[in-house]
Amino acid sequence: LPVALDAEEVSVRKKTVRFLGLTVHKKDTLRIKDEYTIASNRPDIASLIWYTMDVRGLDLKPEENVVKARGELSVFVLYGAEDTEAPVQWLEYSLPFSGEVECPDCTEELIPLIEASVMHQSLEAKPDVDGEERILVSDVVLELDMKFFREEEYDLITDVYTPIRECVPEGKNEVLERLLVRNFSRCRISDRIQVKE
């Protein structure tokens, strides 16, 4: 894309374009490890039967040479209890988390495009200070594909004319990405659902 022509006898027509230029592209991982102690009115854990974990409300924000992360880890677990009256118990809980990933050349002004996916997740029971299996240890590893863009502005030459000599501009088509909307808004939704008995 021609962006300058410094001959006095040549007339040029220019067009100002704004587009996104990729500044930083980095892949990294974020580990979320936390513990949860089950309530005292629940029986001890004999064995874990089934569990699922979700990362909710993940907020990734670039700052100076670092990306800060915060969100909530939601866990649902079925476990076998040592209590014979109720051999199968269920438990659902959420744990807030925060962390950070190093990202050289990142700044707050850059426009982030960060994709996060769960790479690994595990849940295990461990004994508390009394030796009873009452602590659940969750371990989740997120894979982050981080791209940071900067909005750039260039004057492109769209036409050239001179009466002195013949000018044949050569050009080619390029695909440029442009920022349409930059949105920082958040929306909190709450509702009540009635369950028929």
Predicted regions and their residues:
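Viral structural modules
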Residues: 1-197
